[in-house]
């Protein structure tokens, strides 16, 4: 629910994003942050991105990505971006519906910030647990990995989404991990979003994951179920390679984070509203930790996941 399947940065917005992220690679043979190709290679980075990615440079047909090597994450587990804060033990619940083929079905999502971390591509990441229910039945549960860089931008480092049918686990074919099998991580939330900015959320050619986000509005006020939120940020997510997916419209408000999800176009539309924010106690966290660790172990059946270390409890 929180990360879709798309990616591209417009040349017009790239300069602004690069300024925020302390340097970008140039299209083609350039390097991130002004580093030489040799220096980038010695750091284990792609010459075109500056990030610790598979060799071979940026994917064909895309512009260069903002720099995001491990050296830019000195406190990656401190995710305090006001538009997407990830405090340990926080659980967000969203209620809404899925509309498909003219039919509407009840839909809900719980998103929990666990007390676990996971090393991904040289960076310690926050492990979040996302559970997606349709008509009360579990459809998908996902481990998502996030880290905040030194500029305050929150990055996607990978996902392990388990799919279910009739309550039975059917597989996790959309798993991706930054730096494995040609996968590139991307930005989940900018530190200083401004109207018109476009940014990548992730690019994984192997599973056709290709997310593009555009900041469409800032400083808005949105009222939901009697609660009014100020300084609301509106982001449009879409997939250039999949026109049938339409657009997902997300609303963020500080210091809460995501408060609403809407849709425009597409064969299947998701609508969600934040209904509760809880801070879980030790007993609940212990139970969640057990379930998430079990998922983490199951994930090692997938080749790209084996590039990571097992999730561990944060100190």
Predicted segments with their positions:
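C-terminal motif of bacterial Sec signal peptides marking the signal peptidase cleavage site
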Residues: 19-23
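Conserved functional acidic sites
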Residues: 25-28, 33-37, 44, 50, ...
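Bacterial N-terminal signal peptides that target proteins for export
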Residues: 1-14
């Amino acid at each position: 629910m929180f990360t879709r399947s798309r990616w591209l940065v417009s040349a017009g917005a790239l300069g602004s994003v690069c300024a925020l992220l302390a340097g970008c690679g140039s299209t083609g043979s350039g390097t991130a942050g002004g580093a030489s190709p040799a220096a980038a290679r010695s750091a284990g980075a792609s010459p075109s991105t500056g990030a610790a990615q598979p060799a071979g440079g940026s994917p064909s047909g895309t512009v260069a990505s903002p720099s995001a090597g491990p050296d830019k994450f000195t406190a990656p587990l401190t995710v305090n971006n006001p538009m997407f804060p990830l405090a340990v033990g926080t659980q967000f619940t969203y209620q809404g519906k899925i509309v498909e083929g003219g039919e509407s079905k009840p839909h809900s999502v719980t998103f929990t910030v666990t007390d676990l971390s996971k090393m991904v591509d040289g960076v310690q990441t926050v492990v979040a647990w996302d559970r997606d229910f349709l008509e009360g039945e579990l459809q998908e549960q996902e481990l998502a990995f996030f880290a905040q860089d030194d500029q305050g931008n929150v990055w996607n480092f990978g996902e392990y989404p388990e799919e279910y049918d009739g309550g039975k686990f059917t597989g996790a074919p959309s798993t991706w991990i930054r730096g494995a099998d040609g996968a590139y991580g991307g930005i989940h939330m900018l530190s200083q979003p401004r109207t018109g900015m476009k940014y990548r959320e992730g690019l994984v050619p192997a599973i056709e994951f290709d997310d593009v986000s555009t900041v469409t509005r800032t400083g808005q006020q949105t009222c939901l179920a009697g609660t009014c939120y100020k300084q609301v940020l509106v982001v449009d997510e879409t997939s250039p390679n999949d026109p049938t997916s339409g657009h997902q419209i997300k609303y963020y408000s500080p210091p809460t984070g995501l408060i609403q999800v809407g849709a425009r176009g597409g064969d299947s539309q998701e609508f969600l509203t934040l209904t509760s924010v809880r801070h879980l106690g030790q007993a609940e966290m212990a139970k969640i930790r057990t379930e998430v660790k079990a998922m983490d172990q199951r994930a090692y059946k997938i080749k790209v996941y084996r590039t990571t270390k097992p999730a561990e409890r944060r100190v």
